[in-house]
Amino acid sequence: MKVGVLTGGGDCPGLNAVIRAVVRKGVQEYGYDFTGFRDGWRGPLEGDTVPLDIPAVRGILPRGGTVLGSSRTNPLKQRDGIRRIKDNLAALGVEALITIGGEDTLGVATRLADEYGVPCVGVPKTIDNDLSATDYTFGFDTAVGIATEAIDRLHTTAESHMRVLVVEVMGRHAGWIALHSGLAGGANVILIPEQRFDVEQVCSWVTSRFRASYAPIVVVAEGAMPRDGDMVLKDESLDSYGHVRLSGVGEWLAKQIEKRTGNEARTTVLGHVQRGGTPSAFDRWLATRFGLHAVDCVHDGDFGKMVALRGTDIVRVPIAEATARLKTVDPALYEEVGVFFG
């Protein structure tokens, strides 16, 4: 049996661990042949492939990024995109497809399976940790570790100059990275997309820290919005899935704090550094388990499913169900950590 593998959407630490596990188990236990598709959905759209065998995945476990490349190519925006993918898979002799990605990549896989009957298995990937069907996605733990280390380092420079430091982290619709890293890093204010924030309240918290001779750290998710206003954007261009490229709320907030409190404020936007570099031990562990179970899905003929973490178990859920809604921060959880604000 020949199985195709692709990685779509934004890269994140742990992708190579999935690929390695898929190939190792698929070859050694089931005797499968593997074909890698380059750059997400562009690969099957254009028939751009790379051989995947055990030598090809040797040594990639600790590497960040993806050896297959990735992109935000959207076949649904291409003329006859889904049909072209089906035809190319048939021409290459690919009998099943393992798609590793977030809601957009997996959404295309759902269409491919539903409309053309292409056997697909999904593996969830997003550093935002916002897919509802799984407790955690790989890449999230690494991103939180990177953000926490940055916050730790920024405390010392904030104290040296007695200024406010606003740290902008990733999180379009969900504030998991902001909440976890902010709490772990001892931030004095944490702002998330799920809860619109009051700028005056933020300034009050900041001022209270200065009264205690302490330089405050404000952690804000890129998708956070002020109570009276809209999302702050530097760039209003869209990607191929219609998503705005976020960034700008941190800089805007720092200016508001400086203007309203009279205290000097600076912004650090962590950006893509959260997605890069060596995956954490947990992300390697989780990604490897996802890869092993994805191959089992193929072997069992259990298509249209996505592997997911529930407690310590890897389970199978319908891809359509997994992408139907986002997993966001519960208001009660956000209120729980509010004791540390100000």
From Swiss-Prot:
The record marks 125 as: Important for catalytic activity. It comes from the Bacteria. The keyword Lyase does not apply. GO terms for cellular component: 6-phosphofructokinase complex. The active site is at residue 128. Keywords: Cytoplasm, Glycolysis, Kinase, Magnesium, Metal-binding, Transferase. Disruption phenotype: No effect. It catalyses: beta-D-fructose 6-phosphate + diphosphate = beta-D-fructose 1,6-bisphosphate + phosphate + H(+). It is found in: Cytoplasm. Mg(2+) binds at residue 103. Its cofactor is Mg(2+). One of its GO terms (molecular function) is metal ion binding. InterPro entries: ATP_PFK (IPR022953), ATP_PFK_prok-type (IPR012003), Phosphofructokinase_CS (IPR015912), Phosphofructokinase_dom (IPR000023), Phosphofructokinase_III (IPR012829), PKF_sf (IPR035966). HAMAP family: Phosphofructokinase_III (MF_01976). NCBIfam families: PFK_mixed (TIGR02483), PRK03202.1 (NF002872). This is Pyrophosphate--fructose 6-phosphate 1-phosphotransferase. It comes from Streptomyces coelicolor (strain ATCC BAA-471 / A3(2) / M145).
